[in-house]
Structures are given as structure tokens and as C-alpha cells.
């Protein structure tokens, strides 16, 4: 029964559909007019629509003509005419909704409609896909439609240079994955020059497979990180050895449902004996506890060939939703290192966060957001609460003919798979194509062996051979084909009966060496003939497949998400084709074992039902729905909490990134420097003097601190003399004198360097200090979040505590930024150089002890989320990151030292050592310390 919230969300659905139908009618009325246009006249429609929009007409007003133009361009270039329901879907997207369209209804073609309409505003449109292959394929194919209308298309792919990315973003419509768009946003907010930025804003986005991207992948943030120092690798290896000696239920206990472990007293004693320590839980040993927990989790919760595989000396994650190997992705929080130590392969270093954003908060940046999927209704409430997106179900073009059969339940897995093989063999013999869905690599290979033994020819599409996945899926609807797939979520390629003519035609064109980008004229000339030949062959075979019953989808296990099950079923019965689906289950399936197993087990009885006899039962079906509901609710709660905590950081991120953007865009920093100077002097005075008079003040300590900030020229005696006596010196008087002296020093500094050089120095100093302090702040916030759950033990709300303490940390960071900026401005040794060439604006400066953050760009890692908590790590060039070696760590530390104002180690002939702000002092160089850090150091002494 639908929940109250679901009923509320469906209110107005009929009214929305009527509005969309009216748009479709308006487009149909214009269709004949557009068919009479020449190619040149059709292309000029874009120019005319842009002029009208510039003169005040809204995009809503232009929708019928824009959609009619796209429909005609598509008919001419691709031979595909948008159906009325596709026009309705396009209108729903333009209005900022999620269009729920069943598999095979042509979502890729639908996206061209709102993309073109919103590109009329000349502010850039982003079409987000689930992988690089689909981004490239769709931009190439749909780019032909946009080019016929005089618009440009770009694609963002891993490994592109900043210049290439800038060019792709400058296009009217840009395709790419959520990871690439998100990382470019983060990189833009680490840029040193405005010219280094690649994106031009966040105007409108269409997200394909929106549930996969905005729901499944929303639990883990995008992270840009660099290698961190430490000897953690040794401890991972040490604790992997310890974990092997620990016995389940004696030394530790495991909760598979909650994915947690707990160490028992006997286990703690074994660990303490192995390490030679008295108490694992005393403060000095606290960091070791996480190593112990991770090593036990790696042993008990993460299974080889199910959760991960080991290939070429690397641990590679298997995506639980798609069954693919996630190349370069890693579990976070030390889990991946623990698994590497368990398997005896090289343990890679953990990384330090430099920039991060969740997908929820990245997509909230868009002025207007929309999405498409075949299965959004189950998550409608979350889409509305998180993204303010309504879900609009779009009718199918033709009535659904697929028959969804009841589940068959067996006592054990062996009996289940025996019956699965018999069913497949029978369908295969009749020529009916079969698509089999499994939940793991291990099970797909087990089934493959059984099919081979039975003599059934088949293709296996799993995490170990996904390079050919698009080609395999495109042919899964051919006569007599059998395809075993670990999962069909996010595949993105239609299974058409008789074969995918469009895919085959593109492959044939590529085989001829033709490209719509590099050889557009020849491509357009030959496309029609090639497509017609392929289509004729496919249509002939499709008729035979329809006679055999259409595509048969067989699921070997229920997934924990109803959407994944529905996506698998949805591969059959596209566009009104006949089809059939059925799930085979057993009592030993993971979902049945972990949730509600009792009801099913009691129904079947351990002795009364033979192994090879299946039952169909409403009790079991209810148990499955209940189990899936529990898992979905748990995952939704995780995403909700991720968002709550990231919202705290997001407000801080917006403030910092907004500051950086203004600086990059040329804000005059002179006024900011003056404000910083006043604030820092106020802070110094607050820490050294009270509200009374000077009799009780420590003037020596005050002047010592001021000298670290700027070259103070007035003396204590001069201030006292000016006031008349020490007792007549008050705070306002001292502040006025010191501030006057500091501003005079600032003017002298500007006069010495020149106005233009001073502005450039201010820009570089502020950016450098902001970036380093923000990086350290992210580390502090991570550390705070890791331990914030303990506040609940003190009867305090962890989220409220996180907000309060996070704000305090932010205030401390801002104070440190102000203080260090002032110190650097006055104390850095600066060499002013003439412009490099006639085109350069202003002088160049060399500031000793200050370096741009791009120094570490080649060592940055890019971490992308997966729905199972794993992370994808690539380097700056988009290549999979293989290892964080000791040398890389050493190099990173050296570059970090430069970034924080240190010099390289001196040789006897080298320059003098520099102090906290890069000034020559004759003392050893050290990391910049703000006032709070210096006090902590003093207290330790």
C-alpha cells in the first residue's frame, strides 16, 4: 500500500501530464512547417531563437519551436523521429523534473530536446552519463543532431588537459560523467590563475540514470587528495598477521547485517601479547584500535571473488550493483589497505584530503537540474527532499507486453542453479534469447561452468571482461543468444530484438575509419546506406525472435534494492516487444539469509519439500519486499546523514570558494589587506592587554609578537612618552598608535615594490594561505567527524556538536589566514621582475618561501564515489593510480614544506634560513605557526 508521503507526492500528477500533452500537441502542429525547411534554414532557426531569447522571450515560450527543430534535425541525421511521449519527457526535463521512462523508450534521444532548448541561452548545458564510454558515444551520435542545428557539442573524458577541457566546456552542450564534472569543479577552486579554470558555471544539467548517480553513488564524496606521511603501512601488515590468529566468536564477533565487528576480551589479550603492550586502550595506543578493527573487517566481512578480486598483485573492488571491476577504486577509511595486507600484496599509502564535495551538494549548484531513469518512483521522496526534484512518470509509446512471472523458491543454491540451467537450455533450444542476471562474479562463473557442461553457448558479462560489455549487450537480443551478466544497472545500451542496429551501424562506420567529428561530410553521406543495410538484417532476425517469445530475463537472486531488480526486468519488453521475466531464489541467498529468513524457512520445512521442487508463495514475496525495504531504508538514512554533515562543511566551502573566485576574477585585495591588518592587531592586543591601563601590561611580550608580524618602527618608550606616563596608556591609545605604524609600514612596502607588484603579491599570498589552511581544516573536520559519534554517550546530539565545533574550527582557520597573510606580506623576500613579454599584464614577482599550489598537481589523486563505499583513484592525467610509494611520499612532504613557507634544506653556501613568514632570521626554518600554535608549543615546553 502506498505511504501517505507517496500519495502526497503523486498529487497533481494528472495535471502535470496534461500540461506535457499540450506541449506535445503544440510541437506536432509545427512539424509540417519544419519539414519544408532547407538544411540551412533549419540551422538558422537557432540564430533566430537566440535573438528572440535575448529580446526577452522565455525558454518556456520558445519550447514548441525548439522541440520541433530538434525533432526534424534528428529525423534527417539519425532517421529517428521523436514520439509524442518523448516530447513529453523532454518537456518534463526542461521544467526541472525527473522523467521516469521505461527501458527502451529512447531516453538518450529525449535528452536532446531540453539540452538544445536550454543551450539557446548560451550558458552551457551539461548532460551527465554513468561512464566515459556512454559520454563519448552519446556526444558523437547526438552531436550530429546538434550540428545540424548549428550548435557545438563537447565531451569531458579522463586524461584530457585543462586546455582541452576548457574547449569542451565552451561548447553549447557538454557530455561527461558526474565524476569528471565534479572534479573539474574542485580543481577550478584550487586554481592559481583565472585562466586555469575550465568550467563556465552551472546553468542546466540533464542526469541520465539519475537514480544511480544521485542515489546509489551519493553516500561517498568526491575527493581530491595527496599522499600523506607516516608508517601506517607497517601497522596494516602487522595487524593482518594478528587477525589470522583470532578466532570468530571467541576473540571477536561479527554482525553481517550492520557490517560491524567487535573485539572480545580474549582477542584483546592476544593482540596485547603479540604487540608486547600492557593496555591496547590507553591513550598512546588509541590509533592502533582502528588498525585492529579494519583487519578483522577485512578478514570477516570482505570476501575474495565476491566483494573484490586480486589481479596482477592488486586488490580490485567488484561493484555490488553492476558486477564490474572498479578499476582504480579503493575502499576508504583504511579498509582497502587492510584487505591488501590480508592478501599479501603491496599496501598503498592513505591520502590526505585537499578538496572534497558530495554529489548532493555538487548537483545543488545547478540553477536547474533534471534527470531520467526507468526506476525513480521508489525513491521519489528522497529526490524531492534532497534535490527538490519531482518524479513524473511518462507513458510508454506502446503498451507493455512483458509477462512478469512469480518467483520460484528452492531450499538451496545447488538445486536452484540446476533448475536455472534446465530453463535456459530449453529456451535456448527454441531460439529465444535469454539474459541471466547474477549478483556476483563468483556466481556468474559458476553458472557459466554449468552451462558449458550442458553444452549451451553463451557470453559472460562480468567484472572480469567488461571491456566488451557494450558490444555484448547490444547483441543480447539476437536469436538463441544467452548472456550471463553480473548486473544490468547502468549499462546504458539497449537490448533490441534481433540486435541493436544503431550500435552495429556505428561499429561499421568506425571500421571504415569514419568519424562524425573528424570526417563529418563523408560520415553523413555513407551513414544512410550503412544503417539501411544493417537495419534490414536486424529486422529479419527480430521477426524470428518475436515468434520465439522475445527476450527472456532470468534473475538468479533478488538484489537488496528493488530498483536494481526492476532495471533487470526492464531489459525485456522494450517498445511494446513481447518478453518474459522470472526470478529464481533459494533460502541461502544473501538477502533471504540476512533478513526475514524465518518465515520462508518455516513455510518450506527442512524435510517435507524435496530439493528440486520450487514453491510460489505470497509469504516469501512479502518477506523479500520487507527485507528490501529494510536495506533501502538503511541506505537512505546513511545518505541523509552524509548530507546533514556535509551541509555543515558546504557552508564553509561556499565561503572559501567564493573568496577564491573573487580573488581570481581580479578583486582589489588592498582593502582586504587593510582589514586583515586591523583584525590581526586587535587579536594581538586582546591576547596581551586588558581594558585597564598600562601599569600591569607586559609590553615586551606584546612588542615581541608584533615584530613577527610586521617591521614595527615605534618603541615602547615612544608610546609611553606620547601618552605622558605608563598609567595613562589605555587600549584605544595603543591600538591607534600601532595601527598607524602598521599602515605606514604597509605604505612603505607598497612604495618599495610598486603598486602592481604589491597587488600580485597580495593575490598570491592570500591564495596560498587560504589553500593550505583550508586543506588543514578539512583534515581537522574529518578528524572531528570520525569521533563525533562518541558525543552521544554524553547525551549530546552528535550533529549539533559537529555544527558547533566545526564553526569554532572555521573561526580559528579564518584567524590563522588573516595572521599568516599579514606576516607573509611584510616579511617575504620579493624580487620584482619585468613582464615576460609585451602581452603580459603587470610585473612578475618571485617570492622566496612561497610557492603556487600547482607544485603538487602531478601528485594529486582523484577519488570518486561508488555505492558500496569504494573510491576511484586516478592521477592528474586521468590514469589509474598504481601505488603511493615511499618516494612519492617523500616528494610530497618536500613540496608541502615549500607550500607552508619552508625552504629546501640548506647547504653551507645556500641562502639564510627563513622564519615563519619567509623572512631571513638566521634561525632554522620551521612551519608557519599562528599565535595559537605558538602558545600551545610554549605550554608543552
Swiss-Prot record:
<dbReference type="InterPro" id="IPR014001">
    <property type="entry name" value="Helicase_ATP-bd"/>
</dbReference>
<dbReference type="InterPro" id="IPR011130">
    <property type="entry name" value="SecA_preprotein_X-link_dom"/>
</dbReference>
<comment type="similarity">
    <text>Belongs to the SecA family.</text>
</comment>
<dbReference type="InterPro" id="IPR011116">
    <property type="entry name" value="SecA_Wing/Scaffold"/>
</dbReference>
<dbReference type="GO" id="GO:0005524">
    <property type="term" value="F:ATP binding"/>
</dbReference>
<dbReference type="InterPro" id="IPR001650">
    <property type="entry name" value="Helicase_C-like"/>
</dbReference>
<keyword id="KW-0811">Translocation</keyword>
<dbReference type="Pfam" id="PF01043">
    <property type="entry name" value="SecA_PP_bind"/>
</dbReference>
<comment type="subunit">
    <text>Monomer and homodimer. Part of the essential Sec protein translocation apparatus which comprises SecA, SecYEG and auxiliary proteins SecDF. Other proteins may also be involved.</text>
</comment>
<dbReference type="InterPro" id="IPR014018">
    <property type="entry name" value="SecA_motor_DEAD"/>
</dbReference>
<feature type="binding site">
    <location>
        <position position="494"/>
    </location>
    <ligand>
        <name>ATP</name>
    </ligand>
</feature>
<dbReference type="GO" id="GO:0043952">
    <property type="term" value="P:protein transport by the Sec complex"/>
</dbReference>
<keyword id="KW-1003">Cell membrane</keyword>
<dbReference type="Pfam" id="PF07516">
    <property type="entry name" value="SecA_SW"/>
</dbReference>
<dbReference type="GO" id="GO:0008564">
    <property type="term" value="F:protein-exporting ATPase activity"/>
</dbReference>
<dbReference type="GO" id="GO:0017038">
    <property type="term" value="P:protein import"/>
</dbReference>
<dbReference type="GO" id="GO:0005829">
    <property type="term" value="C:cytosol"/>
</dbReference>
<dbReference type="InterPro" id="IPR027417">
    <property type="entry name" value="P-loop_NTPase"/>
</dbReference>
<keyword id="KW-0472">Membrane</keyword>
<dbReference type="InterPro" id="IPR036266">
    <property type="entry name" value="SecA_Wing/Scaffold_sf"/>
</dbReference>
<dbReference type="InterPro" id="IPR036670">
    <property type="entry name" value="SecA_X-link_sf"/>
</dbReference>
<dbReference type="InterPro" id="IPR044722">
    <property type="entry name" value="SecA_SF2_C"/>
</dbReference>
<dbReference type="Pfam" id="PF07517">
    <property type="entry name" value="SecA_DEAD"/>
</dbReference>
<comment type="function">
    <text>Part of the Sec protein translocase complex. Interacts with the SecYEG preprotein conducting channel. Has a central role in coupling the hydrolysis of ATP to the transfer of proteins into and across the cell membrane, serving as an ATP-driven molecular motor driving the stepwise translocation of polypeptide chains across the membrane.</text>
</comment>
<keyword id="KW-0547">Nucleotide-binding</keyword>
<keyword id="KW-0653">Protein transport</keyword>
<feature type="binding site">
    <location>
        <begin position="104"/>
        <end position="108"/>
    </location>
    <ligand>
        <name>ATP</name>
    </ligand>
</feature>
<dbReference type="InterPro" id="IPR000185">
    <property type="entry name" value="SecA"/>
</dbReference>
<dbReference type="GO" id="GO:0006605">
    <property type="term" value="P:protein targeting"/>
</dbReference>
<protein>
    <recommendedName>
        <fullName>Protein translocase subunit SecA</fullName>
        <ecNumber>7.4.2.8</ecNumber>
    </recommendedName>
</protein>
<keyword id="KW-0963">Cytoplasm</keyword>
<dbReference type="GO" id="GO:0065002">
    <property type="term" value="P:intracellular protein transmembrane transport"/>
</dbReference>
<feature type="binding site">
    <location>
        <position position="86"/>
    </location>
    <ligand>
        <name>ATP</name>
    </ligand>
</feature>
<feature type="compositionally biased region" description="Basic and acidic residues">
    <location>
        <begin position="930"/>
        <end position="941"/>
    </location>
</feature>
<keyword id="KW-0813">Transport</keyword>
<dbReference type="GO" id="GO:0005886">
    <property type="term" value="C:plasma membrane"/>
</dbReference>
<feature type="region of interest" description="Disordered">
    <location>
        <begin position="880"/>
        <end position="941"/>
    </location>
</feature>
<keyword id="KW-0067">ATP-binding</keyword>
<dbReference type="GO" id="GO:0031522">
    <property type="term" value="C:cell envelope Sec protein transport complex"/>
</dbReference>
<dbReference type="InterPro" id="IPR020937">
    <property type="entry name" value="SecA_CS"/>
</dbReference>
<keyword id="KW-1278">Translocase</keyword>
<dbReference type="Pfam" id="PF21090">
    <property type="entry name" value="P-loop_SecA"/>
</dbReference>
Amino acid at each position: 500500500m502506498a505511504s501517505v508521503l507517496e500519495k502526497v507526492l503523486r498529487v497533481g500528477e494528472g495535471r502535470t501530464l496534461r500540461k506535457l500533452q499540450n506541449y506535445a500537441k503544440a510541437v506536432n502542429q509545427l512539424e509540417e512547417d519544419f519539414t519544408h525547411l532547407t538544411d540551412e534554414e533549419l540551422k538558422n532557426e537557432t540564430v533566430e531563437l537566440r535573438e528572440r531569447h535575448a529580446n526577452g522571450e522565455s525558454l518556456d515560450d520558445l519550447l514548441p519551436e525548439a522541440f520541433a527543430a530538434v525533432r526534424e534535425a534528428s529525423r534527417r541525421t539519425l532517421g529517428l523521429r521523436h514520439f509524442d511521449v518523448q516530447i513529453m519527457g523532454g518537456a518534463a526535463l526542461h521544467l526541472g523534473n525527473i522523467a521516469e521512462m521505461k527501458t527502451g523508450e529512447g531516453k538518450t534521444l529525449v535528452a536532446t530536446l531540453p539540452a538544445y532548448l536550454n543551450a539557446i541561452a548560451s550558458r552551457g548545458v551539461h548532460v551527465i552519463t554513468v561512464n566515459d564510454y556512454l559520454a563519448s558515444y552519446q556526444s558523437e551520435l547526438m552531436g550530429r543532431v546538434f550540428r545540424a542545428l548549428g550548435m557545438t557539442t563537447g565531451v569531458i573524458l579522463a586524461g584530457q588537459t585543462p586546455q582541452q577541457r576548457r574547449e569542451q566546456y565552451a561548447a553549447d552542450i557538454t557530455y561527461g560523467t558526474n565524476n569528471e564534472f565534479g572534479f573539474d569543479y574542485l580543481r577550478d577552486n584550487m586554481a592559481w590563475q583565472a585562466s586555469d579554470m575550465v568550467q563556465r558555471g552551472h546553468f542546466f544539467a540533464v542526469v541520465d540514470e539519475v537514480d544511480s548517480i544521485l542515489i546509489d553513488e551519493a553516500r561517498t564524496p568526491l575527493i581530491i587528495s595527496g599522499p600523506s606521511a607516516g608508517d601506517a603501512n607497517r601497522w596494516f601488515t602487522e595487524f593482518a598477521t594478528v587477525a589470522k590468529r583470532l578466532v570468530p566468536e571467541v576473540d571477536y564477533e561479527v554482525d553481517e547485517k550492520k557490517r560491524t565487528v567487535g573485539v572480545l576480551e580474549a582477542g584483546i589479550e592476544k593482540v596485547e601479547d603479540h604487540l608486547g603492550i600492557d593496555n591496547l586502550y590507553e591513550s598512546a595506543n588509541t590509533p592502533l584500535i582502528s588498525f585492529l578493527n579494519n583487519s578483522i573487517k577485512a578478514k570477516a566481512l570482505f570476501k575474495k571473488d565476491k566483494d573484490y578480486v586480486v589481479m596482477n598483485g592488486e586488490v580490485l573492488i567488484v561493484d555490488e550493483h553492476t558486477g564490474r571491476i572498479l578499476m582504480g577504486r579503493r575502499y576508504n577509511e583504511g579498509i582497502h589497505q587492510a584487505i591488501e595486507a590480508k592478501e599479501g600484496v603491496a599496501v598503498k599509502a592513505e591520502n590526505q584530503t585537499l578538496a572534497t564535495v558530495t554529489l548532493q551538494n555538487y548537483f545543488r549548484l545547478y540553477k536547474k537540474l533534471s534527470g531520467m531513469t526507468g526506476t525513480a518512483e521508489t525513491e521519489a521522496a528522497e529526490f524531492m527532499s534532497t534535490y527538490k526534484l519531482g518524479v513524473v512518470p511518462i507513458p510508454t509509446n506502446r503498451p507493455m507486453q512483458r509477462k512478469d512471472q512469480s518467483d520460484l523458491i528452492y531450499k538451496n543454491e545447488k538445486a536452484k542453479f540446476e533448475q536455472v540451467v534446465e530453463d535456459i537450455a530449453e529456451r535456448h533450444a527454441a531460439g529465444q534469447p535469454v539474459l541471466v542476471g547474477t549478483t556476483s562474479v563468483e556466481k556468474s562463473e559458476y553458472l557459466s561452468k554449468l552451462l558449458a557442461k550442458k553444452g549451451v553457448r553463451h557470453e559472460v558479462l562480468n567484472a572480469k571482461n567488461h571491456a566488451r560489455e557494450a558490444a555484448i549487450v547490444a547483441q543480447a537480443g539476437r536469436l538463441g543468444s544467452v548472456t550471463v551478466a553480473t548486473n544490468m544497472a547502468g549499462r546504458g545500451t539497449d537490448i533490441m530484438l534481433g540486435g541493436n542496429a544503431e550500435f552495429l551501424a556505428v561499429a561499421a562506420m568506425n571500421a571504415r575509419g569514419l568519424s562524425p567529428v573528424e570526417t563529418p561530410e563523408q560520415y553523413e553521406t555513407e551513414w544512410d546506406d550503412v544503417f539501411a543495410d544493417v537495419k534490414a538484417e536486424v529486422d529479419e532476425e527480430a521477426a524470428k525472435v518475436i515468434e520465439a517469445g522475445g527476450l527472456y530475463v532470468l534473475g538468479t537472486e533478488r538484489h537488496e534494492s528493488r530498483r536494481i531488480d526492476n532495471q533487470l526486468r526492464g531489459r525485456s519488453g522494450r517498445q511494446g516487444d513481447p518478453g518474459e521475466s522470472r526470478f529464481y531464489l533459494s533460502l541461502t541467498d544473501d538477502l533471504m539469509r540476512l533478513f526475514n529468513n524465518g518465515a520462508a524457512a518455516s513455510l518450506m520445512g527442512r524435510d517435507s519439500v524435496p530439493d528440486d521442487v520450487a514453491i510460489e508463495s505470497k509469504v516469501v514475496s512479502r518477506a523479500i519486499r520487507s527485507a528490501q525495504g529494510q536495506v533501502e531504508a538503511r541506505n537512505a538514512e546513511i545518505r541523509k546523514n552524509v548530507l546533514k554533515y556535509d551541509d555543515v562543511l558546504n557552508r564553509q566551502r561556499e565561503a572559501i570558494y567564493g573568496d577564491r573566485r573573487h580573488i581570481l576574477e581580479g578583486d582589489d585585495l588592498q582593502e582586504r589587506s587593510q582589514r586583515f591588518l586591523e583584525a590581526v592587531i586587535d587579536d594581538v592586543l586582546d591576547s596581551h592587554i586588558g581594558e585597564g591601563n598600562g601599569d600591569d601590561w607586559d609590553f615586551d611580550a606584546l612588542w615581541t609578537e608584533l615584530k613577527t608580524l610586521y617591521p614595527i618602527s615605534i618603541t615602547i618608550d615612544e608610546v609611553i612618552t606620547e601618552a605622558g606616563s605608563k598609567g595613562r596608556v589605555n587600549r584605544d591609545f595603543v591600538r591607534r598608535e600601532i595601527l598607524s605604524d602598521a599602515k605606514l609600514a604597509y605604505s612603505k612596502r607598497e612604495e618599495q615594490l610598486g603598486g602592481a607588484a604589491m597587488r600580485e603579491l597580495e593575490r598570491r599570498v592570500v591564495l596560498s594561505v587560504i589553500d593550505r589552511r583550508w586543506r588543514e581544516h578539512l583534515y581537522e573536520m574529518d578528524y572531528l567527524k570520525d569521533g563525533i559519534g562518541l558525543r552521544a554517550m554524553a547525551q549530546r546530539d552528535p550533529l549539533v556538536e559537529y555544527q558547533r565545533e566545526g564553526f569554532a574550527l572555521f573561526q580559528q582557520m579564518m584567524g590563522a589566514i588573516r595572521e599568516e597573510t599579514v606576516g607573509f606580506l611584510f616579511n617575504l623576500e620579493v624580487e620584482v621582475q619585468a613582464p615576460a613579454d609585451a602581452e603580459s599584464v603587470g610585473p612578475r614577482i618571485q617570492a622566496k618561501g612561497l610557492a603556487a599550489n600547482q607544485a603538487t598537481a602531478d601528485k594529486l589523486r582523484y577519488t570518486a564515489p561508488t555505492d558500496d563505499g569504494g573510491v576511484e583513484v586516478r592521477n592528474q592525467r586521468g590514469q589509474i593510480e598504481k601505488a603511493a610509494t615511499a618516494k612519492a611520499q617523500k616528494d610530497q612532504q618536500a613540496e608541502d614544506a615549500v607550500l607552508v613557507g619552508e625552504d629546501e634544506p640548506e647547504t653551507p653556501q645556500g641562502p639564510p634560513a627563513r622564519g615563519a613568514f619567509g623572512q631571513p632570521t638566521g634561525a632554522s626554518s620551521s612551519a608557519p605557526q599562528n599565535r595559537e600554535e605558538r602558545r600551545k608549543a610554549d605550554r608543552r615546553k
